[in-house]
Amino acid sequence: VATPGGQVLEQATDTIARLTSRHPNRAIVINAQPSVSDAPLEAWVQAHCQIPGPGRPQVCGEQITIEARGAAVSQVPGTVLPLLVPDLPVIFWWPYGMPYDQPLFKRLSDLADRIIVDSATCETPERALVRLAELLGKPSEISDMVWARLTPWREMIAQFFDSPSMLPHLYSLQRIEVTYRNPTGDRSAALLLLGWLGSRLGWTLNGTLQRD
């Protein structure tokens, strides 16, 4: 997990602790602050253990936190590599912002089997989604948390047309309008839902996307 520290680091640690009960793991959490004055690279280890239910074994997870500032950020990939467990899949989670042009993301993503991002945290989701599409088919699998959060909506829409009486209406659709409301102004979910609907209907984009 690569974070800029602060609240994002705290949220990542909390998520890892809650995941441990279902998925024992070794989590490597990186607090990378390249714009801060140089300081020696520091690291520490902590354990996440859950109180087991009756008759169940206790499950614990291990978290290694690496703190890097300034030039020390360039040492992070070389520090992470020997900490990976052989023969286990490596999941690389970048929880905030658009990482694609950042050197740390490029180097760490080469070590991962799957990369997880959240396009809802990007200032320009259109650009973020285009870059995500460019990464598809690369050695690492790509997952967007916005796409995962859309799963109930996609299932509901698909179920609506499961009925034989409704299926003919699906292919008579000429126009779709998605109305969304988000206090933060994020529109990545709306864009992904539109893209999914268009791909299922075999539509192609004939114009340039413009924001009102």
Language-model segments: residues:
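An N-terminal, globular interaction/scaffold subdomain
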Residues: 1-101
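Structural alpha-beta junctions
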Residues: 17-29, 84-90, 110-116, 135-140, ...
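Short, solvent-exposed polar/charged micro-motifs at secondary-structure junctions
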Residues: 38-43, 102, 127, 186-190, ...
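Short, surface-exposed, charge-dense and proline/glycine-enriched linear segments
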Residues: 59-65, 123-128, 202-205
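Conserved, well-structured core segments that form the ligand-binding/active-site neighborhood
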Residues: 72-168
